[in-house]
């Protein structure tokens, strides 16, 4: 099928693809504390991630973002997909990845400082708003579990609502 038959008509709702990566090591998870100068999530802990660039698949984007933001490489697997309703014309397609068996030395980047955090300490950290919902779901997953599917929306007061589909 040629590209012209893919149905990407103007005026349709579109998704911007992004990856969000959580690398685990024993009972620790790698998070990045946002740099103080960041417009979004300054000084808050988040997963590693960013945009999928043209020509990349999701796992390649995850590997690139992980290396750029932390200096590490890891074995990645898809754990979930969340559509985020960010506006009337464009949303975000968020591919949630889990990394295991990390290799390399941690480095800071312009995005922030990566830190290994004990899973038991997560509740006491200043986390990005959706992490208290996403992390428990991701961390309980076992190899071979099907990826989860979710949708994030915002109400008239700007409050985030996340719902997950049943398998």
Predicted regions and their residues:
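Short, well-ordered beta-strand micro-motif
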Residues: 23, 96-100, 116
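Active-site-adjacent beta-strand/loop module that shapes the phosphate/pyrophosphate-binding cleft
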Residues: 84-106, 128-142
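Conserved Nudix-box catalytic region and its N-terminal flanking loop in Nudix hydrolases
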Residues: 28-68, 160-167
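A short coil-to-beta-strand element that immediately follows conserved catalytic motifs
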Residues: 71-81, 148
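NUDIX/MutT-family hydrolases
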Residues: 107-138, 158-167
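Conserved N-terminal beta-strand and adjoining loop/helix that marks the start
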Residues: 2-30, 51
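C-terminal regulatory/oligomerization modules of transcriptional regulators
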Residues: 143-167
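Short, solvent-exposed loop/turn elements at beta->coil junctions and helix N-caps
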Residues: 9, 79-86
């Amino acid at each position: 099928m040629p590209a012209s038959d893919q149905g990407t008509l103007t005026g349709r709702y579109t998704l911007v693809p992004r990856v969000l990566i959580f690398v685990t090591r024993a009972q620790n998870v790698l998070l990045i504390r946002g740099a103080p100068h960041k417009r979004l999530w300054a000084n808050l802990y988040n997963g590693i991630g960013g945009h999928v660039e043209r020509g990349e698949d999701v796992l390649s984007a995850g590997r690139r973002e992980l290396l750029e933001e932390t200096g590490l490489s890891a074995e990645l697997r898809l754990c979930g997909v969340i559509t985020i309703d960010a506006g009337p014309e464009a949303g975000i397609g968020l591919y949630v990845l889990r990394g295991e068996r990390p290799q390399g030395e941690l480095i800071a980047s312009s995005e922030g400082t990566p830190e290994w955090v004990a899973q038991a300490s997560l509740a006491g950290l200043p986390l990005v708003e959706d992490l208290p919902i996403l992390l428990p779901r991701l961390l309980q997953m076992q190899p071979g579990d099907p990826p989860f599917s979710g949708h994030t929306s915002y109400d008239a007061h700007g409050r985030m609502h996340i719902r997950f589909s049943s398998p």
